[in-house]
């Protein structure tokens, strides 16, 4: 479900904890490990939100970039590109983690990020086996988009792929004692000004949502 990492402030654009009543910014220290450390005093359902600044990536080869496009079902969206040049990319992450000490206080976030997955139901409701979510780009639902679901229990790892409906919504069946990571990627070609500023051919946005059932 990813590798542990230390906190590095220049990567951060925003970091905050949200519940049904308030939003709390979370200042951290460089080098903190685990990267995010905070004491949650309020009871109920919380969402940890982390947004990064742009970071730079150069692919190892054109083939690696093609593999990425195929894996994320982005080949049609990208179309033709210069295969004589190893692609470069600037990427941002929009990561969320759902947390609770029970099933009270669930709320649905209002979309306000450039790219994000919003939980429409609580995975902690013991009466529900279906988890519903919605994908947004700059406040608008993103339809017919690939969502990749990684999950694991004590013995196995699992992978599932679904598509959002015309309202940007998706749903999956969830199982007890599993950790879930729901992921979506948006990739756009850099315009002339962006290429000059960021030295990148492509810009990507990564939205993730993590919870443990």
For every predicted segment, state its role:
Residues 48-51, 179-187:
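A short, solvent-exposed beta-strand micro-motif common in secreted/extracellular proteins
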Residues 43-47, 128, 177-179:
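Extracellular Ig-like/FN3 beta-sandwich strand-entry sites
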Residues 68-131, 136-141, 153-155, 192-213:
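Beta-strand-rich domain onsets/edges
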Residues 1-36:
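Start-of-domain marker
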Residues 7-11, 140-151:
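Short, ordered, surface-exposed loop/turn motifs in non-cytosolic proteins
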Residues 52-61, 188-193:
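Short acidic/polar inter-strand loop motif in beta-rich domains
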Residues 31-35, 164-178:
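Glycine-centered loop-to-beta-strand initiation motif
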Residues 15-23, 146-161:
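Short amphipathic beta-strand segments in non-cytosolic proteins
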């Amino acid at each position: 479900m990813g590798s542990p990492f230390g906190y590095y402030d220049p990567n951060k654009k925003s970091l905050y904890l949200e519940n049904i009543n308030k939003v709390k910014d979370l200042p951290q220290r460089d080098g903190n490990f685990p990267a995010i450390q905070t004491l949650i005093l309020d009871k109920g359902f919380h969402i940890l939100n982390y947004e990064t600044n742009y970071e730079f990536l150069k692919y190892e080869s054109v083939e690696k970039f093609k593999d990425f496009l195929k894996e994320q079902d982005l080949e049609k969206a990208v179309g033709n590109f210069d295969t004589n040049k190893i692609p470069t990319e600037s990427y941002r992450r929009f990561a969320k983690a759902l947390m609770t000490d029970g099933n009270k206080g669930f709320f649905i976030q209002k979309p306000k990020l450039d790219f994000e997955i919003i939980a429409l139901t609580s995975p902690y409701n013991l009466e529900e086996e279906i988890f519903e979510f919605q994908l947004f780009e700059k406040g608008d639902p993103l339809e017919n988009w690939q969502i990749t679901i990684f999950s694991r229990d004590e013995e196995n790892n699992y992978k599932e792929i679904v598509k959002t409906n015309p309202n940007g919504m998706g749903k999956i069946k969830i199982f007890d004692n599993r950790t879930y990571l729901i992921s979506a990627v948006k990739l756009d070609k850099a315009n002339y000004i962006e290429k000059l500023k960021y030295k990148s051919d492509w810009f990507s946005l990564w939205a993730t949502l993590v919870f443990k059932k």
